[in-house]
Amino acid sequence: MIPEPDEVGPSLRAAMARMAGPDPSLTPIVLGWATVDLDRAEHAFRAALLGFTMASEDMPDDALLGARCRLIRTAVPGVATALLLEPFTEGRLAATLARHGEGPAAVWLREDPAWDPPGSAAAASAPMGRRSSPAQGPFGTEVLLRDGARSGPYRILIVAEPGTITP
C-alpha cells in the first residue's frame, strides 16, 4: 500500500534507512518496492505524489530477485527515486510478495571503498561468503548481501555500474 501524500517522503526514507542498516561504509541509493503489477503501482505512486513532479523509466531486469524493474524519479525531498519490482520468475521477489505482500522489499547500496581499508575490523565483519555471486541488475553488476531473511527485505550491493569494466 502506498502511503498518503504527506507521508510518502518520510515513509520511504525510513524504510530505506531501516533496510540499509547501520554500516556507514554503505550508502543507500534506491528503495525497491515489490508489486504484482508495475502499471498499477506506478499509477498509485502518481496518485500519492499528486503535486510532485514524477517520471518513470523501464530498467533492465534484476536477475538476483527475478524482477522486472521500473524506476520512478520524484521531486519528494530525500527520496529522489524508487524502483518498482514485479516478479517474472518464482524467485526471491515472488517469495517476498507471498510472505509480506506489496511494499518495501529491497535497497540498493554503494560501498565507499575509502571508508574502511581492506583488512580493517569493519571490513572483516562482512565476509565475502555472505555475498551472492555477481549478477546483472537495473544498475549494473550487483551482489546480494546474505545477511537477512530469505524472504527479504534484501540488501543489494552495486559492484559495477553499466559501462564500467570490472577486473
Regions found by a protein language model. Name each.
Residues 12-51:
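N-terminal domain-onset segments
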Residues 37-54, 113-125:
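Amphipathic alpha-helical segments
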